């Protein structure tokens, strides 16, 4: 252990070491620092007996890992003294020795273990500017995080600094005259929908109430109002941003219009830190929700009808097709936007659902009229308030699925055990007004798609990871040949694909223009992650 500690203190980066907890007590010493681990302590704490040159940085559970942070060592050109002094320049900062470090270093998806040297909890735009300036000055890697709900660790970093915007989660202003609402970038979908619904305000948000508003908007925003009002990003009229040079400015159709174009569909982690969004809204008092249940054995019959009907029906109706496993019913559910009255809406909904009702295969059927908040809670019942482990893949589909593809879906979903009830194939209907927007009107390119398919594997403990991921990888491998256009949703990043191939699948023909805009606003590639848009100098 002492040899490892000595090597750790000499390392260029912040290391981890593991402690043999079979012994009751360990005394670790190096230079003039002595650390004691006492297994008899119920909190499994490390006690720093003497600490003049080295700071012990310990996550809450020492069994997993801990850091040695040397005050005599530089990391990415910045001394630990400078890192520690950052706390005097920002409102709130979390270091690895801070009590809640483990909570804040993780995202919603607990598959990913990253260890930043600091997490700045941004309570103001000044906090963001200060952090960006610090990272530029000291060449420290940086990531910006909104709701922490990303499928991949694009907002996480090892040995860098994370700007966590979740303290900034307020509705700043509702402008009744212009029918706009300004919302801070750290807001989560559930609370915001609840607040807006009380004022009869509807914005075409997504369906997962635990999602962050920023990531949802910057990548697209697929939800149950899509076929009438488009993506969430289609309702954005202004964004306040902090650029890589620390300038605070706006992006809209009058100011930095090229950046405004890029941020709508490719904005996550590529060009700037977006601090606030201004959305156009519509007024709505209620929506009508339907749910139909079918036997798993009838999946093919129902899906063949639904997939040809759902993208082309009345634009006020958006629906999705959900398959879980052979032990659970297949669910078709959706939302009809309000008309003249709730009663007339329910009658219209029954009329629109005729192609599915005529199959006479449903084992359950309900229609309910409810508020926007109630609808968000209804659709969000499948969302998880607690973090968990998950792995996703997705595809945009441009033609009805052939029988062979449907058979593959049914086969792989049938392999799941009864206790794998949260694994899911979700097919969202697109089309309508979403498809009337040109593919180059924003950075989001896949406007002619008629479905978005999302395949999800979830598990509760890390020992289930290999089995869960293997199932989905085999499933996805078999299904891939039926999506020759290879278009993916950037809000469902796929790190199994090489970066250049991934960029082409996310942005299509818009990629070259995005690289030009990247070169204009962030030529040094300060904002980056594994599959970020490169500047010209970095493009390979």
Task: Indicate residue ranges for each PLM-predicted region.
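Soluble FAD-dependent oxygen oxidases
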Residues: 2-540
């Amino acid at each position: 252990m002492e040899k490892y500690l000595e090597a750790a203190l000499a390392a260029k980066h912040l290391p981890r070491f593991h402690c043999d907890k079979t012994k009751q007590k360990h005394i670790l010493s190096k230079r003039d620092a002595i650390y004691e681990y006492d297994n008899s302590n119920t909190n499994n704490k490390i006690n720093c007996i003497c600490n003049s040159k080295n700071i012990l940085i310990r996550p809450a559970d020492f069994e997993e890992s801990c850091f040695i942070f040397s005050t005599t060592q530089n990391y990415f050109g910045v001394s630990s003294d400078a890192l520690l002094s950052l706390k005097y320049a920002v409102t709130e900062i979390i270091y690895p020795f801070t009590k809640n470090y483990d909570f804040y270093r993780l995202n919603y998806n607990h598959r990913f273990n990253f260890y930043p040297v600091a997490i700045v909890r941004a309570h103001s735009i000044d906090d963001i500017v200060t952090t960006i300036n610090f990272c530029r000055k000291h060449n420290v890697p940086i990531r910006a995080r909104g709701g922490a709900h990303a499928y991949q660790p694009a907002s996480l970093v090892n040995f860098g600094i994370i700007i966590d915007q979740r303290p900034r989660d307020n509705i700043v202003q509702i402008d009744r005259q212009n029918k706009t609402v300004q919302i801070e970038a750290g807001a989560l979908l559930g609370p915001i929908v609840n607040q807006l619904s009380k004022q009869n305000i509807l914005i075409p948000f997504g369906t997962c109430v635990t999602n962050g508003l920023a990531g949802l908007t910057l990548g697209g925003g697929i939800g149950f109002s899509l076929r009438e009002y488009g993506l969430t990003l289609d309702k954005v009229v202004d964004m306040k941003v902090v650029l890589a040079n620390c300038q605070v400015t706006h992006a809209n159709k009058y100011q930095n219009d090229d950046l405004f174009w890029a941020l709508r569909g490719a904005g996550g982690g590529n060009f700037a830190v977006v601090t606030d969004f201004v959305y156009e809204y519509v007024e709505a008092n209620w929506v009508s929700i339907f749910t139909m249940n079918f036997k798993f054995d009838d999946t093919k019959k129902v899906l063949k009808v639904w997939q040809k009907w759902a993208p082309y029906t009345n634009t006020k109706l958006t629906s999705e097709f959900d398959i879980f496993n052979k032990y659970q019913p297949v669910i078709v559910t959706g939302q009809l936007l309000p008309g003249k009255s709730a009663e007339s809406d329910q009658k219209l909904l029954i009329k629109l659902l005729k192609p599915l009702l005529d199959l006479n295969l449903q084992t359950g059927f309900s229609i309910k009229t409810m508020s926007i908040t109630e609808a968000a809670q209804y659709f969000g019942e499948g969302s998880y308030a607690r973090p968990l482990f998950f792995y996703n893949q997705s595809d945009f589909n441009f033609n009805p699925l052939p029988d062979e593809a449907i058979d593959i879906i049914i086969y792989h979903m049938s392999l799941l055990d009864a206790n794998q009830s949260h694994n899911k194939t979700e097919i969202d209907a697109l089309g309508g007004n979403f498809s009337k927007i040109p593919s180059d009107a924003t950075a989001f390119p896949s406007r002619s798609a008629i479905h978005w398919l999302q395949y999800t594997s979830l598990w509760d403990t890390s020992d289930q990871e290999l089995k869960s991921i293997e199932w989905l990888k085999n499933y996805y491998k078999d299904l891939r040949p039926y999506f020759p256009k290879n278009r993916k949703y950037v809000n469902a990043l796929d790190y199994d694909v090489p970066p250049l191939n991934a960029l082409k699948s996310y942005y299509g023909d818009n990629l070259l223009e995005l690289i030009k805009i990247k070169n204009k606003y962030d030529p040094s590639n300060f904002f980056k992650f594994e599959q970020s848009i490169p500047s010209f100098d970095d493009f390979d």
